[in-house]
Swiss-Prot record:
The keyword Glycosyltransferase does not apply. It comes from Mycobacterium leprae (strain TN). This is Indole-3-glycerol phosphate synthase. It comes from the Bacteria. GO terms for biological process: L-tryptophan biosynthetic process. Pathway: Amino-acid biosynthesis; L-tryptophan biosynthesis; L-tryptophan from chorismate: step 4/5. HAMAP family: IGPS_B (MF_00134_B). The keyword Mitochondrion does not apply. InterPro entries: Aldolase_TIM, Indole-3-glycerol_P_synth, Indole-3-glycerol_P_synth_dom, Indole-3-GlycerolPSynthase_CS, RibuloseP-bd_barrel. Belongs to the TrpC family. Its EC number is 4.1.1.48. The lineage of its organism: Bacteria, Bacillati, Actinomycetota, Actinomycetes, Mycobacteriales. It catalyses: 1-(2-carboxyphenylamino)-1-deoxy-D-ribulose 5-phosphate + H(+) = (1S,2R)-1-C-(indol-3-yl)glycerol 3-phosphate + CO2 + H2O.
Amino acid sequence: MCPATVLDSILKGVRADVAAREACISLSEIKAAAAAAPAPLDAMAALREPGIGVIAEVKRASPSVGSLATIADPAKLAQAYEDGGARIISVLTEERRFNGSLDDLDAVRAAVSVPVLRKDFVVQPYQIHEARAHGADMLLLIVAALDQSALMSMLDRTESLGMIALVEVRTEQEADRALKAGAKVIGVNARDLMTLEVDRDCFSRIAPGLPSNVIRIAESGVRGPADLLAYAGAGADAVLVGEGLVKSGDPRAAVADLVTAGTHPSCPKPAR
């Protein structure tokens, strides 16, 4: 029997938390709330804007580091990100290892006019309707957390609700699975969720094998404009940044620096 990985531990907690929420609000009730929510914003259009986009993340903690920042007002932080030029705001909602919550998602959705990504470990259809009910326009699906049948089903359900799925991969094999499932937006995570180790070369190995019509997002490992430019040179359409922003003294300026680099004439252009 293989030893449990970090991802296994996270998923076990997520399943328990989803079951607890569903015991309070049924699947039929959350579906009704999702249907009654305002229509989702066009996250795909935001990702296709010229230059390298910045997805800025509201992130309180991580399994690898622990607490990252005390975020007293997630809405204020999200507004700073938007003011800095972020195209999409990502909100971590996993409770046990990332200290996130749906309350953070609600606060951010009410505060910004750009699309919002719910970043969590989706293992049940309930979470997809829950994301839409709380105003998400985009949803993370992690290939390593789902078998192929579940991945395809979750992707179809996400798109049926008008959201865009950010399908996260770590290996060439996972990228193949994402493509076979029909992913239109693929994120390559430099951090291995099994071990929490970071490999910034992961993106440059996987991105060349992705079709040009697929949006490519580099996740993790962005510490500043130099990293954004390196990812752009490897074919990124956008970068997702969390830790570097929440730990900066001026998140608006930190986002603006990345946006400036991503839209500068010397920045490599996405191959579309």
